[in-house]
Amino acid sequence: MYQSREYIQKLTARTEPSMRYDGQEAYGDWKLRAREKLSDLLALPFSPCEDAWEILSEKDLGNYGRVDFHFQSEEEYFVPCSLLIPNGAPRPLAICLQGHSTGMHISCGEEKFNGDGDLIRGGRDFAMQALEAGYSALIVEMRYMGSSGSLKDGAPLCARRNAALPALLLGRTAIGERVWDVMRAIDVVSTYFAERVNTENILCMGNSGGGTVTFYASCMDDRIKVAMPSCSVCEFEDSIVPFYHCCCNYVPGIRKYFEMGDLACLMADRALVIVCGIKDPDFPLEGVEKSYRRARAVFERNGRADACILVRGGEGHRFYPEEAWPEAKKLTFLAQT
């Protein structure tokens, strides 16, 4: 009778998302309305500002170059980034987003803290994988993580100190902040690296919290042609409702309007590779498959069934490069057709 946790789960299950796409209106009209609502929920856009872009270091690493830089995404807030650029003709850009880890250096396969090696062995050296797959790689440090916010042992502030919660008091969300940084990073790379990087065909990818930001950024920005979120796309009622997750996963009010599979339909005019681990305890396979089926139905309606892929890895909460990258590479070009 007095089980409040069970009650909120039941309430979630019986709440039909009010903006679910039902096919009764043109897809483009629904997408416009849905994106406007999602933008409101994420508290976007933020106020524009000068990018104050600055190169911090530049290195020739043989087959590729590395440019470390930062830029201003909001007045007085700077975003650290690294851009890895293969030699030769401009390659498609892959945006690589770390989840709850010690920072973006993991994407380059660099060990700085205890436990980093385990993260890298879990397939999280995204930038190096992207280079091998034929992309340029942009690494963006997530707010409240790594050099943008961590403890002495490298632990992200959003997980240990709930540092992302004050954003809610200002009507903001951590996801919205991170999405904004990704969108502004695309602006910066498109402006200053246009001759060295192909930004007409952008892929965005990440695992766990990085997958979540990949997902929402791809919902919001059509410049991202292929989204590859890993261990993050799963119906809310099967993941962040019944199980404990970091506060940075939550967007106030979102479940009244959308489930995660509904939001995935915002990408049904582009391409989506959902990656999951069949033994992932945080994002159970059943909930992942619900999201996938809902999204794929709209992709099919749009004549793009082949542009919505579910990659099932054989283990738990990690990335699966051998299974995922071949699908992403195919869709990087399919997304343009």
Please describe what each predicted stretch is.
Residues 1-65, 337:
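N-terminal targeting or regulatory segments adjacent to alpha/beta-hydrolase or S9 domains
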Residues 76-79, 86-93, 100-103:
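Proline/glycine-enriched tight loop/beta-turn segments at coil->beta junctions
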Residues 97-180, 191-192, 239-241:
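Cap/lid segment of the alpha/beta-hydrolase catalytic domain
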Residues 184, 224-269, 281-289, 300-301:
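Mobile cap/lid helix-loop segments that gate and shape the active-site cleft of serine hydrolases
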Residues 195-208:
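Alpha/beta-hydrolase fold nucleophile elbow
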Residues 206-216:
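Glycine-rich nucleophile elbow surrounding the catalytic serine of serine-hydrolase chemistry
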Residues 267, 274-276:
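Short beta-strand/loop motif that positions the catalytic acidic residue
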Residues 293, 299-337:
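C-terminal catalytic histidine-bearing segment of alpha/beta-hydrolase fold enzymes
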